[in-house]
From Swiss-Prot:
This is Protein ROOT HAIR DEFECTIVE 3 homolog 2. Residues 1-688, 734-823 are cytoplasmic. HAMAP family: Sey1. It comes from Oryza sativa subsp. japonica. CDD domains: GBP. GO terms for cellular component: endoplasmic reticulum; endoplasmic reticulum membrane.
């Protein structure tokens, strides 16, 4: 509570005074906290002192404190009788004294209110005063000095007894204040007091550890005297003023409270007082060093918790955390370090006076808790950094490859630059107080980069391989097909040369391209082998494709050889060709084609396929006589070829036999047609009557022949008719009409004779009309030459004959066919 006191000049000032321990012995922690906060004690650190006063009831303790420190403790009113005024323990702040001085007024001893036997509270309050105070003032009456049973002796005995329950590392100043001083010199009074105190110290039972200990090891004993306040008020106040000066700078070296060992920082004073009183009330020994550690522990924890809460709610940290969750934050570590250092420095400032070991331990815990709270944001930063660096690696690698750099060099450079960028970003994001393990994150990034590089390398190798495979396909497929279609004996020799040249060229270029990837030799050999096998598969696939069309190719080859001569000119069947020999030659060419396509011969191993096919299928061949010697049975009655592996077999012997049978069946018509055309040509060339017919005509027409010789005019007419007929013969190519037989030729000529006569008549009429018109010409025209008429008529006749020739030819052909059937 706050108690107003009167000050000089008639003004009124306030001093913070509070009852912290009631008459019932219970401490009011809230009152203690209110006092500390209101008086400004919490921020004083170690720069404060605690003064308490003990003494008999009614000895003027409260009056002395009020006069000495300007406090407002309740004083006894002498007019109302000598009764107890101070109950329990009161606390206040000294006014106008530096350092900050806490003043405690304790309940007087030897009071009638508690009774003669109730000394428990006296001992407890005395022990509390010794535990928390730097200076303990003992109020004594001057007339009691030297008496054996004076009131001060039980009090001193109580103080020395409770001292044994303390384990304090520092000395406490005992300031003996002699009240109502007489004329006896102070030196004699001091000597008498010290002798009495020494006797009391010697009489007190002490533990073995302190049995030989001197009083000076525990106390600094000081003695002062004051005149009577009631009789010599002015002198009393003057002496109090002099005593007050001794409390100014009391904690400085040489001051009243110079021993500062084990002092509790001001922020922990309330907690310390509460805990000390609790231990005292429980009648336990009070270990002040351990109590100091306890107070430091509790108080440092409170400070650390407060700073942690402040950090968690800090606006700068919240903004930084939000930014880190959404993306990469430049200077993340620097910004977080600044915030962290701020709160750690605040902790250091507030906890600097507590035990160093406790302070350091709690600081580490605070730092650990803050870092634990920030770790998620740091992880997010690493995730963003991982994502950014990985994407940049992908982009840089792709751009480098597009610029034409080799894969291995590009990947190596991009990996180095990306990891350097990651390390720089990691340093930028690290918190200097943290010892977070980032090796796993870095290793994970390296794995992802390596995986992407491996994927890109695989893709590029696949593209490179596909490119060379396509080149091999373009180089081999067409030429191999063309060579196989020729069906020559050296076809596979040509294919082998082509295959080796194309394969070696491709492998040479492919190996040079693979050097950019810096692959191991095992991988290179494997890929080269795969490319070589692909080239072989192209040839084999094309050979199998052509083998599937072997029957069609054989028929084409047969037709080509049969229908064209050695100069590749269309063959005309004039009647003198050897169709049997030509047919054999065509079948031999077709058989050779099937032999070429029967097996893959890339290994240049000899086989007997051609000989077996010729011997077994081509009857009458030059090797047929050796069949019984070389082949004891049918060589085609098998599913495999001799000296040819199954994988290289394209057409089995049984399949060859079946194909040949089908081939013969499908080519018989072409041979029969050739024979028919040859026979037709022969008949067309024999349009003149037979010789016996000519002889018969000569015998039977002898008289008519003699008649013509005797009449030259008839002979001349016959001659003219012959000339005209011959001219017409040549003009209209009458021979062509008789190629398909005499009857068909006559029918064709007869069908075209009437239109020709009509054309001639029309031409004559037109010429006559033109001559009449020319007798009255409007302008001169060139004369019509007779030859032009003939030319015009001839051209029209020829056009008419040519127009009618196809139908006539078809008619003659049909007639000739019918006549042949009838004959």
């Amino acid at each position: 509570m706050e108690v107003p006191i009167s000050g000089g000049g008639g003004g009124e000032r306030f001093c913070h005074a509070a009852q912290v321990v009631g008459a019932d012995g219970e401490m009011d922690g809230e009152a203690m906290a209110r006092f500390a906060a209101g008086a400004g004690l919490l921020g004083r650190g170690l720069s404060y002192a605690v003064v308490s006063i003990v003494g008999p009831q009614g000895s003027g303790k409260s009056t002395l404190l009020n006069q000495l420190f300007g406090t407002s403790f309740t004083e006894m009113d002498a007019l109302k009788g000598r009764s107890q005024t101070t109950k329990g323990i009161w606390i206040a702040k000294a006014v106008g004294i530096e350092p900050f001085t806490v003043v405690m007024d304790l309940e007087g001893t030897d009071g009638r209110e508690r009774g003669e036997d109730d000394t428990a509270f006296e001992k407890q309050s005395a022990l509390f005063a010794l535990a928390v105070s730097d200076i303990v003032m003992i109020n004594l009456w001057c007339h009691d000095i030297g008496r054996e049973h004076a009131a001060n002796r039980p009090l001193l005995k109580t103080i020395f007894e409770v001292l044994m329950r303390l384990f304090s590392p520092r000395k406490t100043t005992l300031l003996l204040v002699i009240r109502d001083k007489t004329k006896t010199p102070l030196e004699y009074l001091t000597q008498a007091l010290k002798e009495d105190i020494q006797k009391i110290w010697n009489a007190v039972r002490k533990p073995e550890v302190y049995k030989e200990a001197a009083l000076s090891e525990f106390f600094n004993v000081e003695v002062t005297a004051l005149s009577s306040y009631e009789e010599k008020e002015n002198l009393f106040k003057e002496q109090v003023g002099q005593l007050r000066q001794r409390f100014i700078h009391s904690i400085a070296p040489g001051g009243l409270a110079a021993d500062r060992r084990g002092v509790i920082p001001a922020s922990g004073f309330c907690l310390s007082a509460l805990q000390i009183w609790k231990v005292i009330r429980e009648n336990k020994d009070l270990n002040l060093p351990a109590h100091k550690i306890m107070v430091a522990t509790v108080r440092c924890e409170e400070i650390a918790d407060e700073k942690l809460r402040s950090f968690i709610s800090d606006k700068g940290w919240l903004e930084l955390e939000t930014a880190a969750n959404s993306g990469l934050v430049p200077g993340f570590g620097k910004k977080l370090n600044a915030i962290l250092d701020f709160y750690l420095s605040e902790y250091d400032t507030e906890a600097m006076y507590f035990d160093e070991d406790v302070r350091t331990a709690k600081r580490q815990q605070l730092e650990s808790e803050i870092l634990k709270h920030t770790y998620d944001a740091f992880k997010k930063m690493l995730e963003h950094l991982h994502h950014v660096v990985l994407n940049k690696f992908k982009s840089d690698l792709e751009q480098s490859l597009r610029s034409g750099e080799g894969f291995a060099a590009s990947a190596r450079y991009c990996v180095q630059s990306s990891m350097a960028e990651f390390d720089a970003g990691l340093r930028d994001a690290l918190v200097k107080h943290a010892e977070w393990d980032t090796t796993k994150v870095r290793s994970k990034l390296e794995q992802h980069i390596e995986a992407h590089a491996t994927s890109v390398r695989g893709t590029k190798l696949a593209e490179l391989k596909a490119n060379y495979e396509k080149k091999l396909l373009d180089t081999l497929a067409g030429p191999v097909q063309s060579i196989l279609e020729t069906g020559e004996k050296d076809s596979w020799a040509c294919i082998r040369r082509l295959y080796r040249h194309a394969t070696e060229s491709a492998i040479l270029a492919f190996s040079a391209s693979l050097s950019e990837f810096e692959l191991d030799q095992t991988t290179i050999r494997k890929m080269v082998m795969e490319l070589r096998e692909h080239a072989r598969s192209i040839v084999e696939e094309k050979a199998r494709e052509e083998a599937g069309n072997v029957l069609m190719r054989m028929k084409e080859r047969f037709s080509t050889v049969l229908s064209r001569d050695k100069d590749s000119m269309p063959r005309t069947w004039k009647g003198n060709e050897d169709i049997r020999a030509i047919t054999r030659e065509a079948r031999l060419a077709a058989l050779r084609l099937m032999s070429v396509m029967a097996a893959v011969r890339l290994d240049d191993k000899p086989d007997k396929i051609d000989r077996a096919l010729t011997t077994a299928l081509l009857d009458g061949g030059p090797l047929s006589q050796k069949r019984s010697i070389e082949f004891t049975s049918d060589p085609l009655a098998s599913s495999t070829w001799e000296e040819v592996s199954e994988k290289n077999t394209l057409i089995t012997p049984v399949q060859c036999k079946s194909i040949w049978r089908q081939f013969n069946a499908e080519t018989e018509y072409a041979v029969a047609q050739a024979i028919s055309m040859q026979e037709a040509h022969r008949r067309s060339n024999n349009w003149l009557p037979p010789a016996w017919t000519v002889l018969l005509l000569a015998i039977l027409g002898y008289n008519e022949f003699i008649f013509l010789l005797r009449n030259p005019l008839y002979l001349l007419g016959l001659f003219v008719a012959f000339v005209v007929s011959y001219a017409a013969w040549l003009q209209y190519d009458i021979t062509a009409y008789f190629r398909h037989g005499t009857l068909s030729g006559l029918l064709t000529i007869t069908s075209g004779f009437l239109p020709t006569i009509m054309d001639i008549i029309t031409a004559v009429i037109n010429m006559s009309h033109n001559q009449k018109s020319s007798s009255h010409p409007p302008r001169h025209r060139p004369p019509l030459h007779p030859q032009s008429f003939r030319n015009q008529a001839q051209q029209q006749s020829q056009a008419q004959v040519q127009y009618q020739a196809p139908s006539s030819l078809s008619s003659s052909s049909s007639v000739g066919s019918n006549s042949d059937d009838e004959s």
